[in-house]
Regions:
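Internal helical hairpin/lid segments
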Residues: 182-188
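Active-site-proximal alpha-helical scaffold in enzymes
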Residues: 13, 60-87, 126, 160, ...
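Active-site nucleophile and cofactor-binding loops and adjacent substrate-binding regions
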Residues: 6-8, 55-67, 114-116
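Conserved active-site "lid/cap" helical segment
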Residues: 1-34, 38-44, 51, 161-177
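Condensing-enzyme catalytic core mediating Claisen C-C bond formation in acyl metabolism
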Residues: 1-5, 103-167, 172-175
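A glycine- and small-aliphatic-rich helix-loop capping segment at beta-alpha/alpha-beta transitions
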Residues: 45-55, 77-78, 100-109
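Acidic, glycine-rich active-site loops and adjacent beta-strand->loop/helix elements
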Residues: 36-41, 63-64, 89-95, 141
Length: 188
């Protein structure tokens, strides 16, 4: 593609198309695409979703966008509002740098503690019942702000909230870390 933003849109469109295809459903069986990205007006998600014949909910939650799409999609299915949802997100290192830090065109030197935004896209289809992975619970995190303002070290800004959310989840669910095969966080 000619721009980083168009490349991100193409990646997300491809991820959505592949997720629907691998689910064994056709596009007309999808009731909603729930997606987000890091760009202004979530344009990658919006432009990717416009190619599909279903509703679209655009979400923005920075590094936690994919988790938010799963929570919203699961709640809509569990509530009986929809039957099938695509949950998706994307990011592109170069478009994120342009928007949040230093445009690559400036040739700025990156500080050693700066994080690297992934260039990639992912999507899955949520449906009630069936085989495979199950969404059984969600814990919505709260903001824990220690006053970190360094745009090159957002991991330090996000880590307290991520830790607080995990601790809250274990307390509320009565589970322990060893009850899980894998614990991952979208936070840096």
């Amino acid at each position: 593609e000619k721009t980083f933003e168009k490349a991100e849109c193409r990646m997300l469109y491809t991820a959505i198309k592949n997720a629907v295809g691998e689910s064994g459903k056709n596009e007309n069986e999808i009731d909603a695409i729930i997606a987000g990205d890091l760009l202004d007006q979530i344009i990658a998600s919006t432009f990717a979703a416009r190619s599909f014949p279903c509703g679209y909910l655009g979400l923005y939650n920075a590094c936690a966008t994919f988790a938010e799409t799963l929570i919203v999609g699961g709640a809509l299915i569990d509530g009986g509002y929809i039957r099938n949802a695509v949950c998706a997100t994307s990011s592109h290192f170069s478009s994120a740098e342009r928007q949040y830090r230093y445009p690559l065109e400036l040739g700025s030197t990156r500080p050693p503690q700066s994080q690297w935004t992934v260039t990639g896209a992912g999507a899955c289809v949520l449906s009630e019942g069936g085989e495979g992975l199950k969404l059984t619970a969600a814990t919505i995190g709260r903001i824990v702000d220690y006053g970190v303002t360094d745009a090159n070290n957002m991991g330090a800004a996000m880590a307290p909230s991520a830790a607080d959310c995990l601790i809250t989840h274990f307390k509320e669910s009565g589970s322990m870390p060893n009850d899980y095969d894998l614990i991952v966080s979208g936070d840096l």
